[in-house]
């Protein structure tokens, strides 16, 4: 019933804020609550989109390019440097396909300085991708005989900010450098998400908690010396207390939990805590240290986010599942379920052994059916996933504006 009001609200927000070029959001559906638990600004999941979703993705890519650089011919795509993962390569292949069909010449440049000549990367389907060394020419970045208007980054820069990407004032670098992990913080994102959720909840006359995971933040935590663990304890206790209060208010008979994870890394390491006393257990703390430092580069986390745990009651073939929504520009272009047979409803599903089941977001049959109980029919549920995914993307837009180091130059 609220669909016209929701879509108008988004339309007005996008008049004020620029969406990231692409985003994916991991959602958790607890039945009583539907919320994002992670928002990725360098999605590597385009291979999970079904062929039916591709026309949507191409249209969204066209819309994005028309706004950024309407006369664009060339697009330089910079993937992760460690590119042997076949799923990741398939995602890059799909991204190239989308932007090629949107009318661009797409070529791949690598930040790996050991690559001096164009180097083929074999694909599972027998094809190959060609990685080429970057060429920096004063204020512009390209490849040999290839000068792009836009540079699309699909590398979260967890190794640091490369000099070759800095001070590119004549081209569009998307997402911007401050979207990478050297500068980005999950806690800042969820601060922005809280702001967005409050505005949206006010529109619908609902409690923002139903779409927003509470969170706290700890800087400078050293698991080895236990310094800073007091901050973790305080935040765990405070968050659990607030969640207990909410569970009581809504008559939810669940034991709340929080997750502790690195604030400035994309890795899968998380620690689930149901009682602050668990942090007195040296074994649990050691597990937390290894979980939070099994982030992509294995570096010790010094900053942590403590986030309300949202259980997932989604199931695919009896395995626990969570929806992931994929967006280009301001449009939902598809989604999939991340499924893990060995994990519980309160555990991280982005772990080895997970599988992916595409969601048919597209197709006219998936428009919400007015008058049906919210969430009862699959289309209504998918629509809500798309709404929450877009709220996470809008929060990313707020976050990137708030953390833009050059913002004062544009005033």
List each model region and its residues.
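Glycine-rich phosphate-binding loop of ATP-grasp-fold ATP-dependent ligases
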Residues: 216-231, 257-285
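Short glycine- and acidic-rich boundary segments immediately preceding or forming the N-terminal edge
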Residues: 1-17, 199-209
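Phosphate-binding site of ATP-dependent enzymes
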Residues: 28, 33, 238-245, 250-257, ...
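Short, flexible loop/turn elements at secondary-structure junctions
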Residues: 26-31, 41-43, 81, 133-135, ...
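C-terminal active-site "lid" helix and adjoining low-complexity regulatory extension at the edge
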Residues: 14, 42-76, 340-411
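Conserved metal-phosphate-binding beta-hairpin within the catalytic cores
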Residues: 17-46, 261, 309, 321-333, ...
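Short, compositionally biased leader-like segments
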Residues: 1-4, 225-231, 290-296, 300
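Conserved N-proximal alpha/beta basic substrate-recognition cap immediately N-terminal to
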Residues: 59-60, 83-255
